[in-house]
């Protein structure tokens, strides 16, 4: 529940930031992400605003980007991850209480949501459909090199002393 609230808050902040900055002449928006994920719908809203922004949004994974946070990260115009960070993509999770028909409705809704999320990963990364299906079945944290290979990011940021 706490993660869902956090990602919902972050999603709303992104919407506000992109809307505000779209009215300005800023050269780029630099979005730094460290999130355990949360509500898929909020992640989709944030991703939509990133994609619709007139100003390019550069994403930076610092620490972690999991679940809904990866949706926002992978749609950035330029996508970065720091060398000590990880990303996690996985199936959505849900719960339902009620009649058999409530369960049937929830399954139909979740199938539709999963299809939409898969479409975003397939469009904005190098991940192939079968590979994506296999990845989504697991809860594996992907290191920066694997994220680069899969096309979740474009660059690994290395730390260097000054």
What are these regions (language model features)?
Residues 1-162:
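Terminal-region recognition feature
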